């Protein structure tokens, strides 16, 4: 369901449930669904916290966070809807980062081009992308010796280029394949085996990709896109 608000589909779920049309919520809890699968928020927060500490080498780094928005007219309360990452995850990472500044942009490359001088003035800083769509156009991130690290929350196939080239140091993302596997297994139990799901809820650990294990990242996307 991410990034759809669960409330937007609950009316339809309520309509279908009496008609023996079972629904599993993935990425968001849905009222009326027979079960739910998502990411363990505590595990996500722990992993991101460890990564930010590792990437900064435990030094004080000025973090700059980027939200994704596809419209300059969108309100701050709505800007986080345009993401394959949940709002709870975004807010959790933003708090952990304790950003010096936050920006809402449609493309990091466009922002970097327009604010090249501002970026050059930064010292000892980290960049945190709170949506992989910020890097979807595959424009390389300009090298900067003052940039300590670049981190992304969420995943798209395009990030392979950034990870392989060392432009992105770390990416933490949801196990979408695991979500789908749980959902299909649950539906098979309900529809084929005619029994209630063995699990009402399944929380999976987040995945992590770095330049060192980028092959694993590619394999994840290869099986997701089959």
At which residue positions do the language-model features occur?
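Flexible loop/hinge segments that line or gate small-molecule binding clefts
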Residues: 6-43, 156-164, 168
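Short, solvent-exposed amphipathic alpha-helices that sit
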Residues: 44-51, 72-100, 179, 224
């Amino acid at each position: 369901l991410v990034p759809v608000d669960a409330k937007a589909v609950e009316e339809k779920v309520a309509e279908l449930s009496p008609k023996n049309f079972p629904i599993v919520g993935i990425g968001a809890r849905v009222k009326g669904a027979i079960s739910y699968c998502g990411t363990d928020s505590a595990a996500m927060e722990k992993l991101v916290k460890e990564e930010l500490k590792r990437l900064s080498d435990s030094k004080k780094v000025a973090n700059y966070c980027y939200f994704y928005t596809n419209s300059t007219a969108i309100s701050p309360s709505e800007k986080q809807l345009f993401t394959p990452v949940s709002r709870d995850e975004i807010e959790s990472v933003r708090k952990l980062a304790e950003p010096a500044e936050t920006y809402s942009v449609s493309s990091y490359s466009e922002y970097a081009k327009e604010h090249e001088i501002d970026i050059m003035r930064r010292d000892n800083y980290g960049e945190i992308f709170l949506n992989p769509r910020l890097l979807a156009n595959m424009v390389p991130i300009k090298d900067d010796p003052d940039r300590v690290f670049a981190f992304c929350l969420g995943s798209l196939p395009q990030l392979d280029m950034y990870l392989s080239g060392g432009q992105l140091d770390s990416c933490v993302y949801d196990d979408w394949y695991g979500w789908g596997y749980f959902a299909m297994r649950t539906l098979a139990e309900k529809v084929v085996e005619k029994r209630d799901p063995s699990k009402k809820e399944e929380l999976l650990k987040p995945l992590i990709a770095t330049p060192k294990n980028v092959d694993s990242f590619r394999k994840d996307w290869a099986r997701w896109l089959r």
